[in-house]
Amino acid sequence: MTEVITSIQDMQRLAHDFKHDGKSIGFVPTMGALHDGHLTMMRRSVKENDVSVASVFVNPLQFAPGEDYDAYPRDIEKDTKAAESAGIDYVFHPSVEAMYPDEIGVALKVGKLAEVLEGAQRPIHFNGVVTVVNKLFNIVQPDRAYFGKKDAQQLAIVEKMVQDFNHPIEIVGQDIVREDDGLAKSSRNVYLTEQERQEAPALQKSLQLAEKLYREGERESKIIVEAVTAYLESHTSGHVDEVAVYSYPELVEQHHIEGRIFISLAVKFSKARLIDNLIIGDEEID
């Protein structure tokens, strides 16, 4: 049976004991509102580690004023049952007061990797992400941590943080998990109206169009971006926030495509901003 732990000290003691006993710890950090994407990572952690921990913590540091922090769905009972169904041993569910008892005196700041894509739209977001992930890594002390490739920029930033701060942790990227119609699973999909939900699979279809152009030999980013943008504008009622082509994981904007590239898009519907991406041109990220 899955045990819920709310105390940082209790989680640290448990992690210390597991380490002392030579057991490997797998960790899936989440903000809750669990869906099949999260559960796929949890099942993988259970398969690959002796002990598996999932965190459920809606991190205020990564939300700017006016974003959906207060509205973000919270249901720890439902999330615990879902985590238990995936075989998770422990759900770490600290309070905001436990994680941030005082005003933050020291926080991490991401460099150039956060100046593009989502980071350009949400300037404080990734600073909040790496600060909380760094804290969670210190508390849970995992051997492996699992992140979804749907947030590929986040994955690249976390991998760089682990490298720069010498965390002895293997970062495992999990393929995007999709609905039957191709929409990437996301906790924010619940915000879509019925009409928007019918339109949302166009995000993946536009990426498939980009891949088709690439496979046919197109190497000019401008042509691919224009084709994807036109497809999204004609197949959804949302506002196309961004379509861009970057190298991966360096996240340098590409004008003429060479090597591994990351095609990223964001569409803003009435109450939800959805992202999707495709990595092509070289071996997939592990």
UniProtKB/Swiss-Prot annotation:
Residues that coordinate or bind (R)-pantoate: Q62, Q154
Gene Ontology BP, a term: pantothenate biosynthetic process
Active site: H38
Pathway: Cofactor biosynthesis; (R)-pantothenate biosynthesis; (R)-pantothenate from (R)-pantoate and beta-alanine: step 1/1
Catalytic activity from the UniProt record: (R)-pantoate + beta-alanine + ATP = (R)-pantothenate + AMP + diphosphate + H(+)
Keyword annotations: ATP-binding, Cytoplasm, Ligase, Nucleotide-binding, Pantothenate biosynthesis
One GO molecular-function entry: pantoate-beta-alanine ligase activity
Residues involved in beta-alanine binding: Q62
Record flagged with keyword Nucleotide-binding: yes
EC number(s) on file: 6.3.2.1
Any single Gene Ontology cellular-component annotation: cytosol
InterPro entries the record matches: Pantoate_ligase, Pantoate_ligase_C, Rossmann-like_a/b/a_fold
Known role: Catalyzes the condensation of pantoate with beta-alanine in an ATP-dependent reaction via a pantoyl-adenylate intermediate.
Family to which this protein belongs: Belongs to the pantothenate synthetase family.
Other comments on record: The reaction proceeds by a bi uni uni bi ping pong mechanism.
HAMAP family, A to Z: PanC
The protein, known as: Pantothenate synthetase
